[in-house]
């Protein structure tokens, strides 16, 4: 069965021993918690590992407004960029806000993690990590238990380590 935001939420709720939901808009504590946190949890998992399905390459044009001092060029991140993974330049570069500043000439080639919202692109390991991250993020709201929350954090950390293997 294909994953949905509801099925991922229900996996997180099951880990917490809570009742499943039928929709993120259900008028229940569980649905409200999942609805409030699922996008933040998803983006945190995306940032936590260079997932193949979320990795993109792009050549950035220099911004028309140069940095005030030190560096000669600024390059704005793509709008769907969550994390810069690689910048293809021998020049020094730094991230400032949502820009890369450097003396590198345009175009600046980068590899980055994109914000993927199409759930059909998620791989199974990502779905498991996402459910664990969501469980950790909603654990205290659902269970009022610090130990349960800490356990979900630990399980999430282990799942992310598994992804790195």
Regions found by a protein language model. Give the residues of each.
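An acidic- and aromatic-residue-enriched active-site/binding cleft used to recognize and process polar
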Residues: 18, 26, 56-60, 115
């Amino acid at each position: 069965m294909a994953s949905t935001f509801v099925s991922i939420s229900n996996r997180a709720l099951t880990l917490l021993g809570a009742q499943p939901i039928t929709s993120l808009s259900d008028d229940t504590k569980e649905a409200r918690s999942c609805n409030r946190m699922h996008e933040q949890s998803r983006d945190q998992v995306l940032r936590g590992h260079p997932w193949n399905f979320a990795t993109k390459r792009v050549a950035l044009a220099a911004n028309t407004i140069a940095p005030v001092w030190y560096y000669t060029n600024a390059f704005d991140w793509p709008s769907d960029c969550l994390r810069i993974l690689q910048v293809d330049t021998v020049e020094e570069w730094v991230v400032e806000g949502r820009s890369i500043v450097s003396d590198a000439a345009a175009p600046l080639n980068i590899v980055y993690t994109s914000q993927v919202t199409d759930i059909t692109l998620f791989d199974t390991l990502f779905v498991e990590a996402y459910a664990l991250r969501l469980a950790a993020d909603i654990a205290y709201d659902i269970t009022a238990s610090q130990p349960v929350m800490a356990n979900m954090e630990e399980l999430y950390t282990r799942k992310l380590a598994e992804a790195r293997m």
